[in-house]
Amino acid sequence: MTRTVLVLNGPNLNLLGTREPQTYGRRTLGEIADECAAFAETRGFAVDFRQTNQEGQLLDWIHQARGRVAGIVINPAAWTHTSVALRDALAAVELPVVEVHLSNVHQREAFRHHSYVSPVALGVICGFGSLGYRLALEHFAERFEAAA
């Protein structure tokens, strides 16, 4: 089995560190990517960390993941609440998925309370800032160790 986890990030996450830091924190997406890579390396696997503001690009990356990665960590951002296509793509590739959100979406506007992704994810981590990514990767580290 491949020991790579695809970490996908949706729209506006390229603005982390400057966009609403009181909600999303001060870490940049580049810093989060570096932290994810360093954590994965200590646990013996790799991450492929990506971000896009184009929904079609995100869907293409998900489709290409089948047979190439062991699982997906995804912060779908606003597409969480709007994209049936994203939900369908994640279901179609039949990979384990962990959904991550920096903020606690359930403490925010009502429209953020619904996720199209959650029904096809193994779990959801929200409200812990950038730590959520590491927690999601910890899940995959434990899967790899159990399979060894």
Swiss-Prot record:
SUPFAM superfamilies the UniProt entry points to: Type II 3-dehydroquinate dehydratase (SSF52304)
Record-linked Gene3D superfamilies: Dehydroquinase, class II
Record has GTP-binding as a keyword: no
Pathway: Metabolic intermediate biosynthesis; chorismate biosynthesis; chorismate from D-erythrose 4-phosphate and phosphoenolpyruvate: step 3/7
Enzyme Commission number(s) from the entry: 4.2.1.10
Annotated site, Transition state stabilizer, chain positions: 19
Single GO BP term: aromatic amino acid family biosynthetic process
Signal sequence range: none
Molecular function terms, GO-annotated: 3-dehydroquinate dehydratase activity
Reaction(s) catalysed (UniProt annotation): 3-dehydroquinate = 3-dehydroshikimate + H2O
Residues reported to bind substrate: 75, 81, 88, 102-103, 112
Keyword field contains Lyase: yes
List of catalytic residues: 24 (proton acceptor), 101 (proton donor)
Family matches, as NCBIfam families: aroQ (TIGR01088), PRK05395.1-1 (NF003804), PRK05395.1-2 (NF003805), PRK05395.1-3 (NF003806), PRK05395.1-4 (NF003807)
Assembly, per entry: Homododecamer.
The family this protein is said to belong to: Belongs to the type-II 3-dehydroquinase family.
PANTHER family to which the protein is assigned, alphabetical: CATABOLIC 3-DEHYDROQUINASE (PTHR21272:SF3)
Function per UniProt: Catalyzes a trans-dehydration via an enolate intermediate.
UniProt protein name: 3-dehydroquinate dehydratase 2
Organism of origin: Pseudomonas aeruginosa (strain ATCC 15692 / DSM 22644 / CIP 104116 / JCM 14847 / LMG 12228 / 1C / PRS 101 / PAO1)
